[in-house]
Amino acid sequence: MRYRTFGATDLATSEVAFGTWALGSNWWGETDDPDRLVARALELGITFFDTGDAYAQGRNEELVGRALARAERDRIQISTKFGYELDERRREHGEGERPQNFSPEHARRALEASLRRLRTDFVDLYQLHNPRMDAIRRDDLFAELEALRDEGKLRHYGVALGPAIGWREEGLIALETRRVSALQTVYNLLEQAPGDDFLAAARRTGAGIMARVPTSSGLLEDKYTPETTFGPTDHRRHRPRAWLVEGLQKIERLRFLVIEGERSMTQAALKWILQQPGIANVVPTVTSFAELEEFAGAADAPDLSEEELERVAELHARAFDVEPARA
């Protein structure tokens, strides 16, 4: 594993982080044992764990806190999120957004609840979860985040954009006006906008970008076929069929990135992200030991050559020479 910091900050991270979203819910299908997954991640050198209070309505944080209880706190980084009203009745399923609350009072109340679930006195990164512009413009909210930092309950704060790709203006204002330490966004070989704009802004402000959905919801893991179907609770079931059909064609255009026995398609996808200036880490959602080993191996996989990077840029500019498929 390799390590870096978030831009000009002192927030450290393993290049490959552990996205815990799937733990405690069934929105990614079945998952392996959370305690053993986290233990193996630590063995592989992963130090950064990204969760959120809305994931399984707090249960995710409980699982992460339990799994990390024996880890040396000064050797790991815990990142969580706030902004949604929790509802115990929705612990298993993730469909649909809940009411949001970005009041200063909720930020403090939510953080204190997260600290209890995570079994820690502080979090390394506290993120606004899918904020809209009105939340990012709230001076009272950011004053409260500064107060919480002064109290030692958080080290850095940032913004996690979503739920879907986009939110360009929100991200740029968070970086350039609010001067957040971190911004988390969808970014991968197939989906590079508006991530490229965020990377440029982060380089100017000294922040770090966290790339979520780095394998485009599994497409770049090279495990789907045109016949692939997803379970009834799997969020990918709700994507249009064109996403799968076009994605598979694009992956074939990227086949040159694979080096047999040295760099898989998954690892090439993560490595490409890690070679973009301004990236702090990649945050794949981990559901199994096989995925975990594959993701962690990306940090030490061979870099993409300049020629390969240029070829990717040319393909992306031409939409990978793929005709739009019918939904």
List the predicted regions and their residue ranges.
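Beta/alpha (TIM)-barrel catalytic core signal, keyed to glycine-rich beta->alpha loops juxtaposed to Asp/Glu
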Residues: 131-325
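Active-site mouth loops of central-metabolism enzymes
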Residues: 21-32, 93-105, 130, 134, ...
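Residues at the N-termini of beta-strands
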Residues: 15, 48, 122-125, 156, ...
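Active-site groove signature of glycoside hydrolases
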Residues: 115-134
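Acidic (Asp/Glu)-rich catalytic clusters
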Residues: 8-10, 67-73, 77, 115-119, ...
